[in-house]
């Protein structure tokens, strides 16, 4: 079996480590016994990935729950029975200096791969709680806003305590937050999800499986 990646120039590779990183970036998604030739657009996508990875690392290491590079948008959900919008879903975006707005399909896989997703989720939870507080102060009646979490985050031993502290710090009721979880893929994940669902229920938090 083989994978062949051809480059028309490698001027920006300063050492062997950078070359391996470049090669793996293009080779990993390839099928076996195949080859590809890289052009200028491919090099740009590699550099964009490097920049995005560096920004995600900085966001995670900085640790601020108020990081301005992470944005939350609340998308209203219509209640067809009541005929109004009474819930919403929190959507995450990044706004970076060199690239502008970045959508989840570009940064979520990188964040999960490199272990940064938990910090992003806690930032979104914090900003969602703040948005709920602002909605309430302005007289909007929202039953709850859902926030997405990945299965991998649930195994963090501090997950529930961090979740609880963020919600309480923002002064919102637990029932105004809903947690949307990725569907479990094996028995181990199923047990973990079930345990967390029961913990959320004890707090008054509604949970959904995506």
Predicted regions and their residues:
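Hydrophobic "anchor" residues on beta-strands that sit immediately upstream
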Residues: 71, 144, 176, 206-207
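Conserved long alpha-helical elements within nucleotide-processing catalytic cores of c-di-GMP signaling
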Residues: 24, 105-109, 118, 198
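Active-site core of bacterial EAL-family cyclic-dinucleotide phosphodiesterase domains
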Residues: 42-110, 148, 209
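C-di-GMP signaling machinery
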Residues: 10-71, 111-115, 153-160, 193-194
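Conserved ATPase "switch" residues in P-loop NTPase domains
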Residues: 64, 136, 201
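Catalytic core of bacterial c-di-GMP phosphodiesterases, primarily the EAL and HD-GYP domains
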Residues: 2-16, 39, 82-87, 116-192
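Short beta-strand/loop segments at the ligand-binding rim of alpha/beta enzyme cores
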Residues: 197-210
């Amino acid at each position: 079996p083989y994978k062949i990646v051809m480059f028309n120039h490698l001027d920006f590779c300063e050492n062997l480590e950078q070359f391996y990183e470049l090669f793996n970036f293009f080779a990993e998604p390839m099928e076996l016994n195949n080859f590809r030739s890289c052009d200028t657009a491919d090099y740009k996508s590699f550099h964009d990935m490097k920049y995005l990875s560096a920004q995600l690392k900085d966001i995670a290491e900085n640790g601020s729950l108020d990081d301005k590079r992470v944005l939350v948008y609340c998308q209203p959900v219509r209640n067809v029975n009541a005929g109004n919008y009474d819930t919403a879903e929190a959507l995450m975006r990044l706004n970076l200096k060199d690239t502008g707005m970045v959508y989840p399909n570009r940064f979520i896989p990188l964040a999960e791969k490199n272990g940064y997703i938990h910090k992003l989720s806690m930032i979104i939870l914090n900003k969602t709680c703040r948005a709920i507080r602002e909605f309430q102060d302005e007289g909007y009646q929202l039953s709850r806003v859902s926030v997405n979490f990945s299965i991998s985050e649930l195994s963090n031993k501090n997950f529930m305590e961090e979740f609880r502290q963020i919600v309480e710090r923002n002064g919102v009721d637990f029932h105004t937050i809903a947690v949307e979880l990725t569907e479990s893929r094996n028995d181990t994940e199923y047990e973990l999800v079930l345990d967390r669902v029961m913990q959320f229920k004890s707090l008054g938090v509604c949970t959904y499986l995506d």
